[in-house]
Regions:
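Acidic, glycine-rich A-domain
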Residues: 2-161
């Protein structure tokens, strides 16, 4: 994530980075790593270095939160990039079909706002459910997490070309 942030900063593009986790519907925790208005520097690097995995993946809520922030930005192309390790899930019956359909609805809502949602996952089973959520060209499965530092900047360049 740190290397990707460095690469994003080098492009000169405005960007924000957030992490999220959940334990039931309330609250979905959103951790600001870098806001759009914040300059990339030591404080941001420290937040990125300190992030740890936690709890569950209530993807629909995270996408809606990101969509609200991103839709307020004046940029012509607005990429909503989701980096995840698995499919939508949470404790309160957000498993299976409900989590999948809520996430799919959040993706459709993002597109209606003029955003470009795209998912990057390290979940080897991602091809089983991500086409339904993001469409055939709206995601990529990176099976080896060690490839993320190399692949994310290249993917960003392709998505924003």
């Amino acid at each position: 994530l740190w290397l990707f942030a460095e690469a994003l900063d080098a492009t000169g593009d405005r960007f924000a980075m957030h992490g999220f986790s959940s334990r039931r519907r309330d609250p979905v925790r959103v951790h600001t790593l870098k806001s759009f208005d914040e300059r990339y520097g030591g404080h941001v690097r420290g937040r990125i270095a300190a992030i740890k995995p936690g709890y569950y993946t209530r993807m629909g809520a995270a996408l809606r939160h990101g969509s609200n922030m991103l839709s307020a930005q004046p940029a012509g192309r607005r990429l909503l990039l989701l980096l995840t390790d698995g499919k939508p899930n949470d404790l309160d019956q957000y498993e299976g079909r409900y989590g999948i359909e809520d996430t799919r609805q959040a993706v459709l809502e993002a597109r209606r706002l003029g955003l470009q949602p795209f998912c990057v996952t390290i979940d080897r089973k991602g091809n089983d459910y991500l086409p339904h959520l993001f469409g055939n060209n709206g995601y990529v499965v990176i099976k080896n997490p060690a490839e993320l530092p190399k692949r994310l900047p290249m993917l960003y360049a392709q998505l924003t070309a």
